[in-house]
């Protein structure tokens, strides 16, 4: 295991108003610094085997049928760091049950974003996938099994600016902006992730891209991406707030 280092994070939150609102998006950044010693937290709702304190603060499965008759499901699991140290989110798994308790689907190796979250911060396990041979009423319950550990990798975030979110006929939404490397190390395979929230601060979708080129020290590069298979009724007007993360690919062993 790598030694626990002081972790640095820069979280950029862009509040995006719905169409027709004349207010300009606001930008808020926050600096998180890890504590050298981990103190015991009081009564966490979930605790991983290594003592990582977290809770599943929201989960939902939304089912829809696309234009060619294929059933899709969007699964969202929100994970909140309730402890006092940074947490690493590895790929997780979940089951989907119908209203009778019957198993409809079981999924593994489900992506999580971002890979490291600070105390009080939220991440998500997220997937959009097809449901084979499904003909139910769409009322599904998520049985989530996130993989959460205390982080032994640094929490690194890159600055994001010039962001706009707009409708896209094919991808549902289009996210455009720039990412800047203000650290002293170049990075490859940099993730840029958008998590979309409604007016009640509930996550309603996500999209991401991976920068194809190295992000050199001091460089600022543009990005543009859309959703993979967001629900058919998803538009930019559904989004009250978008939180963006840019960070290097990190694996914890």
Spell out what each predicted region is.
Residues 131-170, 229-253:
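Terminal connector regions
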Residues 43-72, 143-172:
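Low-complexity, acidic Ser/Thr/Pro/Gly-rich terminal tails and inter-domain linkers that flank the onset
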Residues 1-5:
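Positively charged n-region of N-terminal signal peptides that target proteins for export
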Residues 84-89, 103-104, 184-189, 203-204:
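Short acidic/proline- and small/hydrophobic-mixed sequence motifs that coincide with surface turns
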Residues 79-84, 179-183:
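Asparagine-centered strand-capping/turn motif at beta-strand->loop junctions
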Residues 104-133, 205-232:
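Intrinsically disordered, low-complexity Pro/Gly/Ser/Thr-rich segments with frequent PxxP/GP/PP motifs
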Residues 15-18:
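C-terminal motif of bacterial Sec signal peptides marking the signal peptidase cleavage site
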Residues 20-22:
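Bacterial signal peptide processing site
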